Amino acid sequence: YRNRQTNIDIRVVGSRTSGGETDYLSLIRKAVEYQNKNQISVSEGDSVWVVADGDVNYNNPDPITAKDNLLSKARKMADAKGIQIALSNPCFEFWYLLHFQYTTKFFKDYPAVKNALTTYLPDYEKAGDVYNQLAEHTAIAIQNAKRVEQYHLQNDSSKPFGIAVNPFTDIYQLVESLL
C-alpha cells in the first residue's frame, strides 16, 4: 500500500478582510507573487489556489460579458503559472449551502444565497467560523457540487464555466485536493 505524506500550508492572501484587491487579475498577481517569493514549485507537487466569487454587479452595462472577460484573462494568467482557480458563483456561500441541499436555482447575489443558507445556519455571518457546522457534511457538499456541475454540462454549458453559469462552484476540487 501507499503511505501518503501531506504537508499542507494554507495561506490567505488578498482577502477583503485584509484590505486587498479581490478582482480576478489582482488575486492571480498576488498568487504569482506569493508563489515566486516562497519558491513554490508545481513540478514538485506544490499547488497554489485562488478562490474567487462571481460577484456580478448588475448595475454595470453588460455585466456578465465584462466579468467573463476578466475571468478569461485571469485563467490564462493562472494557467501559465500553474495556479488553480476555484470559482463559486454567485458567491462562496453557495459552497456552504451545498453542505445542506442540492439546488440549481439561480441566485442573483450574496444576499439571495445567504437567505437560503440561514435556513440551515440561522446565525450565519460572513466573517464567522462555521467549520464545525459544515465539516460533517463535506462529503454531501462535494457530491452536490458535482451534481450541479453535471446539470450545467447537460444543459449546454461547457467547462471551464463562466459567470453566466449560476449557481456553480468548483470549490470541491480544492477540498478534494486537501483530503
What is each stretch, according to the model?
Residues 2-15, 32-49, 54-179:
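C-terminal accessory helical subdomains adjacent to catalytic cores in phosphodiester-
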Residues 19-33:
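Short phosphate-binding loop-to-helix
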